[in-house]
């Protein structure tokens, strides 16, 4: 599985697919994302360190995706992301976050801000048709409105 790439066209950035402890929601009907996980933090860190070693900083932006939300990555990996950003002059990092973790976003942004790194949070809303999103896709946002979602998410997909 390829875990590093460079996106050159729309919103140029480097992107890494890291491995974490797995999505805690695991109910989205269309998703097999949660299958790429490992409960061994040291194994995850070793794999993630190999992937992050490929980052060059070419666009000063890094997108970090994983088998869940940013909070499913171990602390050593999170520290290595910060170190990589500092060493490669990356000023903006994009992370994914499921709605169930939205209260953890401010602490993440503050931690990275201490290192002069801007954090952008992306969440997979998929649709604002609440009935379809919750009863068919099983996304777990409840009746959250776009206004509520934008209080923690900078980007939606």
Language-model-derived ranges and their functions:
Residues 112-116:
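C-terminal intrinsically disordered extensions
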Residues 33-48, 54-74, 85-103, 117-146:
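Core AdoMet radical
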Residues 87-88, 148-157:
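A structural motif corresponding to the C-terminal end of an alpha-helix
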Residues 16-17, 23, 52, 85, ...:
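Generic hydrophobic, helix-prone segments enriched in Leu/Val/Ile
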Residues 50, 76-83, 107-111, 144-151:
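Alpha-helical scaffolding segments of alpha/beta enzyme cores, especially the outer helices
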Residues 4-46:
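Canonical Radical SAM [4Fe-4S] cluster-binding loop centered on the CxxxCxxC motif
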Residues 28, 108, 134-135:
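Short aromatic-enriched loop/helix-cap "lid" or pocket-rim segments at secondary-structure transitions
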């Amino acid at each position: 599985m390829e875990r590093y790439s460079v996106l050159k066209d729309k919103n140029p950035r480097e992107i890494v697919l890291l491995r974490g402890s797995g999505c805690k929601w695991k109910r989205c009907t269309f998703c097999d994302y949660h299958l790429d996980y490992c409960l061994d933090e040291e194994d995850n860190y070793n794999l993630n360190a190999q992937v992050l070693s490929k980052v060059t900083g070419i666009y000063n932006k890094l997108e970090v995706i994983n088998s869940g939300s940013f909070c499913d990555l171990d602390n050593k990996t999170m520290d290595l992301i910060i170190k990589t950003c500092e060493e490669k002059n990356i000023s903006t990092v994009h992370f994914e976050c499921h709605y169930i973790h939205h209260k953890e976003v401010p602490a993440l942004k503050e931690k990275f801000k201490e290192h002069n790194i801007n954090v952008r949070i992306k969440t997979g809303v998929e649709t604002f048709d609440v009935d379809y999103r919750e009863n068919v896709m099983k996304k777990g946002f409840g009746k959250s409105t776009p206004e509520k979602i934008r209080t923690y998410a900078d980007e939606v997909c």
